[in-house]
Amino acid sequence: MATKLHFLLLLFAFFGLASCKTHQLIHSSAPGNELFKVAILYPNGEGKTFDMDYYEKTHMPMVAGLLGSNLQFYEIDKGIAGRTPADPIPYLAVGYFYVKNIAAYNKAIAENRDAVVNDIKNYTNIQPVIQVSEVRKIGLNAAK
C-alpha cells in the first residue's frame, strides 16, 4: 500500500510539473525553464548495506527540507536488478533532487554539510557518487 502511495505521489509530482505546458514538450534549456537533477548513487558491492526505510522516511525528507522552494520534487529508486534479472544490481539505491537553481542547491548543502554527511552513517556504509545534470527535456508518452 505504501509503495502504491509513493508511486501515486511521484506521478502527481511529475504531472504537476509537466502540466504547466501540457500541449508541448518542456525544453529545459530555454531561458527560465532551467531544471537540474542531482543524482546520489549508492553503488552495490560486497559488504555494502543500505537501510531504505530510513533513507525514505528520514534522510531524504530532511535534505529536501533544507532545499526550500528551490526544490521542485525528489525521487528515490530502489535497485531491483541489473541489465538482466540474473545480473546483480549496480546500485542499491539512487536519490534524485530536481532543483531550479544549482547555485542555491550548492549553497543550501554547503550550509548544512555536517548535518547531511553525519546522517549518512545512519542508513549506509556506502560512499555515495554524486552527478549533477541539466534536464534537457521532459516528454510524455504520446501513445497513451
Locate the predicted segments by residue.
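Macromolecular interaction modules
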Residues: C20-K144
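Bacterial Sec-dependent N-terminal signal peptides
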Residues: M1-S28
